[in-house]
Structures are given as C-alpha cells and as structure tokens.
Amino acid sequence: MTSISDSQIIVILLSVFITSILALRLGKELYQ
C-alpha cells in the first residue's frame, strides 16, 4: 500500500466537503 501524503489528504477532504455542500444545496432546491 502506498502512503498517502498530507497534501493528498487535504485535497480529498476539500473535495468531499465541496461535494457535500453542493448535494445539500441541490437537495434543498428539490425539496422546496
């Protein structure tokens, strides 16, 4: 297994954070 660097972890966390925000906004628009 290859070791994951800190920069890769930050990028993954940012991408998950952004996608979760977009999903929440889309869900709110569809709910209303």
Swiss-Prot record:
Its main location: plastid. GO terms for cellular component: chloroplast thylakoid membrane; photosystem I. It is found in: Plastid, Chloroplast thylakoid membrane. It is a single-pass membrane protein. The chain crosses the membrane at residues 4-26. One of its GO terms (biological process) is photosynthesis. It comes from the Eukaryota. Keywords: Chloroplast, Membrane, Photosynthesis, Photosystem I, Plastid, Thylakoid, Transmembrane, Transmembrane helix. SUPFAM superfamilies: Subunit XII of photosystem I reaction centre, PsaM. It holds the Pfam family PsaM. NCBIfam families: PS_I_psaM. This is Photosystem I reaction center subunit XII.
